[in-house]
């Protein structure tokens, strides 16, 4: 996965956001997605870290869904939302902007 230069994050981000990284990893394991999907999801999350804790669950879920798309792991928004304990709408509203911000062209469906 090649993220755009704007999406590079400092090394300390992984430590500061370890709770959310673990949640992404746990959900990825539950969904049986590839290591590539999990890595893409964590990279997206750490590059987009919101300052508000309220935004983090939905962002983490959207990052996992986007990571699945990037790596070709077909998972539904509903399955990802359930694994991350957020609403499907939270995932639906956030995944396309995430991909665009990272320099990807999201699918048009």
Language-model-detected regions and their locations in the chain:
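Non-catalytic, interaction-prone regions of core transcription and DNA-replication machinery
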Residues: 1-109
């Amino acid at each position: 996965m090649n993220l755009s230069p704007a999406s590079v994050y400092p090394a300390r981000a992984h430590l500061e956001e370890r709770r959310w990284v673990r949640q992404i990893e746990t959900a990825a394991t539950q969904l049986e997605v590839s290591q590539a999907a999990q890595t893409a999801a964590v990279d997206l999350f750490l590059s987009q870290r919101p300052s508000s804790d309220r935004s983090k669950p939905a962002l983490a879920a959207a990052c996992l869904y986007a990571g699945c798309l990037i790596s070709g792991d077909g998972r539904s928004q509903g399955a990802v939302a359930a694994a991350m304990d957020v609403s499907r709408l939270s995932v639906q509203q956030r995944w396309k902007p995430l991909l665009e911000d990272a320099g990807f062209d999201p699918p048009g469906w």
